[in-house]
Amino acid sequence: MATKPFFRRRKVCPFSGDNAPKIDYKDVRLLQRYISERGKIVPARITAVSAKKQRELAQAIKRARFLALLPYAVK
């Protein structure tokens, strides 16, 4: 008897939609959700962010790091 194939449900981008938050480099609380404990940017396949929004998110995180709002690395 063949087993039924397992289909993983596609996650929805948290930045697409009507009342989705805007990506802003000054919004440190929002950006910290997309940074690992070590300070690295979490990949889109884990956070389910679309490719376009992942680029915006990475740019905002890098900008916030440059302005010392976020750390480059956590020891």
From Swiss-Prot:
Pfam families according to UniProt: Ribosomal_S18
GO biological process: translation
PANTHER family noted in UniProt: 30S RIBOSOMAL PROTEIN S18 (PTHR13479), SMALL RIBOSOMAL SUBUNIT PROTEIN BS18M (PTHR13479:SF40)
Similarity-based family: Belongs to the bacterial ribosomal protein bS18 family.
Record's protein name: Small ribosomal subunit protein bS18
Subunit structure and binding partners: Part of the 30S ribosomal subunit. Forms a tight heterodimer with protein bS6.
Main function: Binds as a heterodimer with protein bS6 to the central domain of the 16S rRNA, where it helps stabilize the platform of the 30S subunit.
One function term, GO molecular function aspect: small ribosomal subunit rRNA binding
One GO cellular component term noted in the UniProt record for this chain: cytosolic small ribosomal subunit
Keyword terms of this UniProt record: Ribonucleoprotein, Ribosomal protein, RNA-binding, rRNA-binding
